[in-house]
Amino acid sequence: MADQLTDEQIAEFKEAFSLFDKDGDGCITTKELGTVMRSLGQNPTEAELQDMINEVDADGNGTIDFPEFLNLMARKMKDTDSEEELKEAFRVFDKDQDGFISAAELRHVMTNLGEKLTDEEVDEMIREADVDGDGQINYEEFVKVMMAK
């Protein structure tokens, strides 16, 4: 499954993996998964976190290592119910629910994920996605960016 990913995708997933792997030991625990999900405004139960880990924990050791994470991401990318997932992701970024992701909202979520970005980097991310040039990202623009990944 993961062999269908490009080098660029693998590099991006490695970066995402390290956001989850807070202590840098090469494994994501339920505790680390919970921390990241809560920073994104989700509130999973311990049982839900365990289910998520069990779903991809090929060797059964109770944690997710990078190859297992890659398989999960490859599966998620093939998922056809991505429309609902995209809407959910957009809602996570769109803090005030006004239908737009502002630079401030983008910075807030990225900071919660542990990504310290400069104002220039945040503005650049907005510019890359902002097709109509209004300085913020609407849902259609968000979908375009996410589908291009």
From Swiss-Prot:
Residue ranges of every copy of the EF-hand domain listed in the record: 8-43, 44-79, 81-116, 117-149
Name of the protein in question: Calmodulin
PANTHER family noted in UniProt: CALMODULIN, MYOSIN LIGHT CHAIN 1, 3
Family assignment from sequence similarity: Belongs to the calmodulin family.
Binding site for Ca(2+) 2: D57, D59, N61, T63, E68
Modified positions (N-acetylalanine) in chain numbering: A2
Domain of life: Eukaryota
Residues involved in Ca(2+) 4 binding: D130, D132, D134, Q136, E141
Alphabetic keyword roster: Acetylation, Calcium, Metal-binding, Methylation, Repeat
Species of provenance: Triticum aestivum (Wheat)
Binding site for Ca(2+) 1: D21, D23, D25, C27, E32
N6,N6,N6-trimethyllysine: modified positions: K116
Miscellaneous comment text of the record: This protein has four functional calcium-binding sites.
Physiological role: Calmodulin mediates the control of a large number of enzymes, ion channels and other proteins by Ca(2+). Among the enzymes to be stimulated by the calmodulin-Ca(2+) complex are a number of protein kinases and phosphatases.
Gene Ontology CC terms: cytoplasm
GO molecular function: calcium ion binding; enzyme regulator activity; protein domain specific binding
Binding site residues for Ca(2+) 3: D94, D96, D98, E105
